[in-house]
């Protein structure tokens, strides 16, 4: 692993430090200020007649980003999480320590500098070193002298390296953290209680997806990584909680692309004595809150598309297929005509697909990508909504919506099915679909039906994909850009290292 000549040179320098009685991985030294705090606190120094303040002494830490050696002195750019700060190190103050520094210090090393604030002739606020310590010797050279890491695969596989050399990546994940904390704060302010439900399920449920399977040795049974927390959260509504939410991971054993990762983060929330129409209004308030918190305008650009949050609309599923998808009503209303139309459009469909699934195929191909501004699509076919409440006026549709923004589904919500007998029949239909070969059809969950039989109040529930939400609000084009360690196909790592020169 460490046979590369450039790594060997650095290992030799680490061993040389040990021979001098210095630990190249020193511990226990503390900084007194972050780099940003130093720059703010001592900004006044640049205005002094003699731009220095020897009465002050601070310790700063960070990674060496740039090193300029000039005879008996050197300038070092040091980066911590907050900012980059320059240090000036001179042989006059450090004597033999300066010689050791020149011999051993390299770009990438993590250091501590203790000294007083001063400004250079060019007016740059810096720290004049009185002490200098290498805290962690880097034995692998960093790429391109911090000019950036452009290999996309390497960025995702070695995210630590990506974070070191690409500051904008760190900014994305700071924004992600702010988005998640803002979502949490919003729901707490709205009166929702945050809860935690199991990550391993005896029966996978809550969504149509293929699960990951594991094995519990003590119980001697298979367990499934959860594909959704929905059925457990609704059990809590049965138990008497009236407004709950959970932010956590879901796992779906499916394909990967720029908007899908098998391990992803969602918020799901359930609201007793409310309907899906209430969720639509709640979602609008959530986005208003997030835009304000992130200081984003109502119009944002995502993937070269202008998304206007002031142009939010609501449209029914069939109306969207007709007015946006361009499919006539007489085709949409007849299953055989719709199948023929899809085949004419060279869309590959299974011959035994139900009417509801044919509509879904048409929607995916002709409508979804055109929904740029926030669009709540309502009145979904009941056949593709096995957990949603049946509409009172039309039993063929569900009281359900999905929110689309920039051509992608962002949220899914509905008035919950709380009739245990209806739910049991729908589970039976799902089992029949699974027996026909539909691996994503849901399993029978008799325990959940039994819970419903104890009475669940009228409830509305919704899920929002956090990763896609972060993509939208940060402009990221791939879900891998907003997940710190995305799923990647394993490769043999040859640990190539190129010269820093």
Curated annotation (Swiss-Prot):
From the UniProt record, which GO molecular function terms apply?
Answer: ATP binding; lysine-tRNA ligase activity; magnesium ion binding; tRNA binding
| Localization (cell) | Cytoplasm
The record lists Mg(2+) 1 as bound by 402, 409
One biological process term from GO is: lysyl-tRNA aminoacylation
User: Catalytic activity annotated for this protein?
Assistant: tRNA(Lys) + L-lysine + ATP = L-lysyl-tRNA(Lys) + AMP + diphosphate
Give me the Gene Ontology terms describing cellular component. Answer: cytosol
InterPro entries, alphabetized: Aa-tRNA-synt_II (IPR004364), aa-tRNA-synth_II (IPR006195), aa-tRNA-synth_II/BPL/LPL (IPR045864), Lys-tRNA-ligase_II (IPR002313), Lys-tRNA-ligase_II_N (IPR044136), Lys-tRNA-synth_II_C (IPR018149), NA-bd_OB-fold (IPR012340), NA-bd_OB_tRNA (IPR004365)
How does this polypeptide assemble, per the annotation?
Answer: Homodimer.
State the family named in the UniProt similarity comment for this chain: Belongs to the class-II aminoacyl-tRNA synthetase family.
* Protein name as it appears in the record: Lysine--tRNA ligase
The gene name reads lysS
């Amino acid at each position: 692993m460490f046979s590369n000549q450039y790594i060997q040179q650095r290992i030799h320098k680490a061993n040389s430090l040990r021979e001098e009685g210095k630990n190249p991985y020193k511990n226990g030294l503390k900084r007194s200020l972050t780099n940003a705090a130093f720059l703010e606190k001592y900004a006044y120094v640049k205005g002094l007649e003699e731009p220095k303040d020897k009465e002050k002494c601070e310790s700063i830490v960070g990674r060496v980003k740039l090193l300029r050696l000039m005879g008996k002195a050197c300038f070092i750019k040091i980066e911590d999480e907050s900012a980059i700060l320059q240090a000036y190190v001179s042989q006059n103050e450090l004597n033999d320590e300066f010689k050791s520094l020149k011999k051993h210090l390299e770009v990438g090393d993590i250091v501590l500098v203790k000294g007083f604030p001063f400004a250079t002739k060019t007016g740059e606020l810096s720290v004049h070193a009185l002490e200098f310590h290498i805290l962690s010797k880097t034995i692998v050279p960093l790429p391109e002298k911090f000019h950036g890491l452009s290999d996309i695969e390497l960025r995702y596989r070695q995210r630590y390296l990506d974070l070191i050399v690409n500051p904008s990546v760190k900014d994305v994940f700071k924004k992600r953290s702010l988005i998640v904390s803002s979502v949490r704060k919003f729901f707490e302010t709205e009166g929702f209680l945050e809860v935690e439900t199991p990550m391993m399920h005896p029966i996978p449920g809550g969504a149509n997806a293929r699960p990951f399977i594991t094995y519990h040795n003590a119980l001697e049974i298979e367990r499934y990584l959860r594909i959704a927390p929905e059925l457990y959260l609704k059990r809590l509504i049965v138990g008497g909680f009236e407004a709950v939410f959970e932010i956590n991971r879901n796992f779906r054993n499916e394909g990967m692309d720029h908007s899908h990762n098998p391990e992803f983060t969602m918020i799901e929330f359930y609201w007793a004595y409310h309907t899906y129409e209430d969720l639509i209004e709640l979602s609008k308030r959530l986005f208003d809150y997030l835009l304000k918190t992130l200081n984003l305008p109502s119009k944002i650009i995502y993937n070269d598309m202008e998304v206007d949050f002031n142009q939010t609309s609501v449209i029914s599923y069939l109306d969207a297929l007709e007015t946006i998808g361009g499919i006539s009503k007489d085709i949409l209303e007849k299953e055989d005509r719709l199948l023929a139309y899809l085949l004419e459009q060279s869309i590959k469909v299974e011959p035994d697909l139900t009417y509801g699934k044919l509509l879904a195929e048409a929607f995916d191909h002709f409508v979804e990508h055109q929904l740029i501004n926030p669009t709540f699509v309502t009145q979904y076919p009941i056949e593709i909504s096995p957990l949603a409440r049946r509409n009172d006026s039309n039993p063929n549709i569900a009281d359900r919506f999905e929110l689309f923004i920039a051509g992608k589904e962002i949220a899914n919500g509905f008035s919950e099915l709380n009739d245990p007998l209806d739910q049991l029949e729908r589970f039976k239909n799902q089992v029949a679909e699974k027996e026909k070969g539909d691996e994503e059809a849901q399993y029978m969950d008799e325990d959940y039906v039994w819970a419903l039989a104890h009475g669940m109040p009228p409830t509305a529930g919704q899920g929002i994909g956090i990763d896609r939400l972060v993509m939208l609000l940060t402009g990221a084009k791939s879900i891998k850009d907003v997940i710190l360690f995305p799923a990647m196909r394993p490769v043999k790592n040859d640990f190539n290292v190129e010269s820093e020169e």
